[in-house]
Amino acid sequence: MSNQHIEELNDQQIVRREKMAALTEQGIDPFGKRFERTATSGQLNEKYADKSKEDLHDIEETATIAGRLMTKRGKGKVGFAHIQDREGQIQIYVRKDSVGEENYEIFKKADLGDFLGVEGQVMRTDMGELSIKATHITHLSKALRPLPEKFHGLTDIETIYRKRHLDLISNRDSFDRFVTRSKIISEIRRFMDSNGFLEVETPVLHNEAGGASARPFITHHNAQDIDMVLRIATELHLKRLIVGGMERVYEIGRIFRNEGMDATHNPEFTSIEAYQAYADYQDIMDLTEGIIQHVTKTVKGDGPINYQGTEIKINEPFKRVHMVDAVKEITGIDFWKEMTLEEAQALAQEKNVPLEKHFTTVGHIINAFFEEFVEDTLIQPTFVFGHPVEVSPLAKKNDTDPRFTDRFELFIMTKEYANAFTELNDPIDQLSRFEAQASAKELGDDEATGVDYDYVEALEYGMPPTGGLGIGIDRLCMLLTDTTTIRDVLLFPTMK
């Protein structure tokens, strides 16, 4: 460490380094060694929740805990402090005559943020707080910087996102939210595994973007001297596995899209995609509803949930409505009727629906009407199905009306949570759809993809009728933690 760096330190940091040096002089490693604890704060609080001060005195139970020193008070020969571990905090009561003079000095000189190991007797104070009466203190690790806003938690939004470690230390609500996120992902896996799905891994680096309509991140592979893209979906590789006979597969992983950022979008996000042979989009609706209701029940319990003051009846059967019917209900316009592109464009102009250059079919305009008028009305869980074929290049056409596909999206609180369909397994039709997407790309549609000839070739070997699904896990985490911004459910969101 240079003298220049030492001079830049503030007074608190200098004092902490002096204490670090003093520990070394005493033969104590400032950054500790392995420590065996017998209990966490949560285990102790649960085990002794119904024990009185007298009960604990009689049973003389001992415990060894470890964690970060969060508060400390007292002077002279007696001190109180709170130790924080992954499950919460527990108070320690330290007396000089119980731990000895030398050991008491370790406690006395410990700074907030230091890690301590505490061995002692479980007790309850006169105020009724469960505590550990220390018989020995072990220094485990020195914190060379003071914690932010000692008693009130970290509140600066920029710091919360840039320095998540400080947020987790200071804000228990934030810590618990990310524990819930992990539980959500674990329960998704549990549900999928119990329903016979096999978890697999597919490449993050692709030669061609595909499986979704999105702008990719482009990178360069130096060894092979080729440009590659970060995946915008896992779909096409997973469906190759269906061709290969795996029948039920899923992947939970990061997806990368080089697009805008807002309260519900981050350039990298987590999704689950799943594919089931011999199923159609109706089966996948049932699967989607099952996943979300299972996870919600496990994490939040039975009954509806509350999101930002609105009751969401996530425990009840989800509504199912065709896109054309949804548009008709809100606008009165009936797109079931056959009409020319010019007639549809006139209706769009009449209703002030923005039209893009690549909206070259009635299907594009139906989708634009839906996005303009319907999405913001979908509060309760709703499956919207029957998307136009032009905006669904990987979905199978509907047998009854081939203008539309056997596709659905799940909306809750006006946001899309899932996208799924009966997969297109006709390689000739698939090639035609890819070529239409390539044409749209040439007309300025940045989200359109090119032709994946390798995938078309895979389909030519035969893929069974298949249903597929994608769920945005980050949005589901937002819903189940009552959070309004995606950054609050991403440990390390993208920052400038």
Swiss-Prot record:
Binding site for Mg(2+) 2: 416
Binding site for Mg(2+) 1: 409, 416
InterPro entries for the chain: Aa-tRNA-synt_II, aa-tRNA-synth_II, aa-tRNA-synth_II/BPL/LPL, Lys-tRNA-ligase_II, Lys-tRNA-ligase_II_bac/euk, Lys-tRNA-ligase_II_N, Lys-tRNA-synth_II_C, NA-bd_OB-fold
Subcellular location: Cytoplasm
Cofactor: Mg(2+)
Molecular function GO labels: ATP binding; catalytic activity, acting on a protein; lysine-tRNA ligase activity; magnesium ion binding; transferase activity; tRNA binding
Top-level taxon of the source organism: Bacteria
Cellular component per GO, a single term: cytosol
EC number: 6.1.1.6
Coiled-coil spans in chain: none
Entry keyword set: Aminoacyl-tRNA synthetase, ATP-binding, Cytoplasm, Ligase, Magnesium, Metal-binding, Nucleotide-binding, Protein biosynthesis
Cofactor binding remark: Binds 3 Mg(2+) ions per subunit.
Gene3D superfamilies to which the protein is assigned, alphabetical: Bira Bifunctional Protein, Domain 2, Nucleic acid-binding proteins
Reactions performed catalytically: tRNA(Lys) + L-lysine + ATP = L-lysyl-tRNA(Lys) + AMP + diphosphate
Gene Ontology terms: biological process: lysyl-tRNA aminoacylation
Subunit annotation: Homodimer.
PANTHER family given in the database record: LYSINE--TRNA LIGASE, CHLOROPLASTIC_MITOCHONDRIAL (PTHR42918:SF15), LYSYL-TRNA SYNTHETASE (PTHR42918)
Family listed: Belongs to the class-II aminoacyl-tRNA synthetase family.
Name of this chain's protein: Lysine--tRNA ligase
Underlying gene: lysS
